[in-house]
Regions:
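A glycine- and small-aliphatic-rich helix-loop capping segment at beta-alpha/alpha-beta transitions
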Residues: 60-68, 87-90, 110-114, 137-150, ...
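Internal gly/pro-rich beta-alpha loop/helix module
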Residues: 140-226, 235
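Accessory alpha-helical/coil subdomains and C-terminal extensions
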Residues: 165, 183-186, 208-289, 293
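Short beta-strand segments
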Residues: 48-50, 73-76, 123-128, 187-193, ...
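Active-site segments that bind and position negatively charged phosphate/pyrophosphate groups
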Residues: 269-346, 354-355
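N-terminal amphipathic/basic leader segments beginning at the initiator methionine
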Residues: 1-44, 48, 56, 81, ...
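Glycine-rich oxoanion-binding loops at beta->alpha junctions
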Residues: 75-119, 160, 164-165
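Internal helix-turn-beta structural module
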Residues: 330-419
């Protein structure tokens, strides 16, 4: 007689299906195909792709762009070119700090898009990492690298870093779109920043800049940046505030990731509820919050799914191993212990979570007890920021491998009706 599966087994099987379907919906090739489906462009068509997902996006776009295609350029991270693309030159450069090869690729893109007419179109594909990879500095490269390193070392956030970068570049802050004018620019964006601020994704090469020179100067002074007179003068200059030749479409973001995960939940018989797609709290707090929701609704008699998208933070207290998604799962494990019909998983869409080979973590009502049986102190592991080893001891690590996309993270609480 075949042994009846336990509720946690069903929950884990569902979690695997949800993860697979959610990530598939935001892969670069699928995102580009959605954006270009049914689009027609008059005149000559050029392709420029920049970012960590640039090769995949360009590969998909090239299959869609047949008529009047005149050439393209890809600038992506080292190791991210996966073969030749017909009539497209591919460059690999430095990330998170630009190098000479980043500049060579950008120079090729600028040369390709020079002297265009108003009947021409530049299909511009943008993804995370574009700030470093798509660069034409208005300063010597070594000086720009030093400014970037100063900002990173000072703990500046991505918005602050990009506010500075825009003013030190000939392509950021809308300047690439202005370079392409009078040609039309059709920008397809794979967003890796919460809220999808188009002027901040890859420092907005094809979008009007909403930041001001006053803000840039304030950031530089607040972090005590050591800058040349030329750099200070550039920070005091304004960037383009209006662009009339650009159409932009966000085709992959944490919103799409959450929506796809919710659709997968619904297909599996759950009632999904997206709590937020801008999650940005402490990771362990997110885990505790979902555990509280689980205890509130565990006996509702319904199959429920609560979803959150975004990017939590981890304040390192000790030198353990883990990542924000693993820490969410470990925190949740403590809160849902004993609930036979509850499971929490959290996964990074890029397939990596912190400095580990895991994409995230998964925990159910038995996880904390299993840890004790294995001699693992879950509370101490959480305090030591050592979620990787704690979850790894009980099969709680999610490993997808590199996915080729990056649209933040998705966290899901599943509750099944007791069977």
């Amino acid at each position: 007689m075949q042994e009846k599966s336990k509720p946690v087994d069903n929950l884990r099987a569902d979690a695997e299906k949800i993860i697979t379907r959610a990530i598939a919906a935001v892969l670069p090739d699928a995102a580009v195909e959605r954006a270009l489906k049914g689009k027609t462009f008059l005149g000559r068509v050029y392709l420029v792709a920049a970012g960590k997902a640039a090769w995949q996006m360009a590969h998909a776009a090239r299959a869609c762009l047949q008529d009047n295609f005149c050439g393209g350029v890809v600038v992506t991270k080292y190791g991210h070119v996966n073969g030749e693309i017909a009539n497209v030159a591919c460059f690999e450069g430095g990330h998170p700090v630009p190098d000479e090869n980043s500049l060579r690729g950008t120079d090729a893109a600028l040369a390709l898009t020079e002297d265009l007419t108003e009947s021409d179109t530049v299909v511009f594909l943008l993804s995370g990492g574009g700030s470093a990879l798509f660069e034409k500095p208005l300063l010597p490269l070594a000086e720009l690298q030093d400014v970037t390193n100063q900002l990173l070392a000072a703990g500046a956030d991505i918005v602050e870093i990009n506010t500075i970068r825009k003013r030190l570049s000939a392509v950021k802050g809308g300047r690439f779109a202005r370079h392409c004018a009078p040609a039309q620019v059709f920008a397809v964006v794979l967003s890796d920043i919460l809220g999808d601020p188009l002027d901040m994704i890859a420092s907005g090469p094809a979008y009007p800049d909403s930041s001001s020179c006053a803000q840039a100067l304030d950031i530089a002074k607040r972090y005590g940046l050591h800058l040349s007179e030329r750099a200070w003068a550039l920070l005091a200059q304004e960037t383009p505030k209006t662009l009339t030749n650009v159409e932009t479409q966000i085709t992959g973001s944490v919103r799409e990731l959450c929506a796809a995960a919710a659709a997968a939940c619904e297909a599996l018989g759950y009632e999904p509820m997206i709590l937020t797609d801008c999650l940005c709290c402490e990771a362990r707090e997110a885990g505790s919050m979902l555990a509280s929701i689980a205890r509130t609704h565990a006996r509702d008699g319904k199959n429920l799914a609560f979803l959150m998208g975004g990017e939590t933070v981890v304040h390192l207290r000790e030198k353990g191993l883990g990542g924000r998604n693993q820490e969410i799962a470990l925190s949740a494990a403590l809160g849902i212990e004993g609930l036979s019909n509850a499971l929490v998983f959290s996964v990074g869409s890029d397939g990596t979570d912190g400095p580990t080979d895991a994409a995230g973590g998964i925990a159910d009502g038995e996880t904390a007890q299993l840890m004790r049986q294995k001699g693992v102190d879950a509370v101490q592991s959480l305090n030591d920021n050592d979620a990787y080893h704690a979850l790894g001891a009980v099969g709680g690590l999610l490993k997808t491998g590199a996915t080729g996309t990056n649209v933040n993270d998705v966290t899901v609480l599943l509750l099944r009706t007791a069977e």
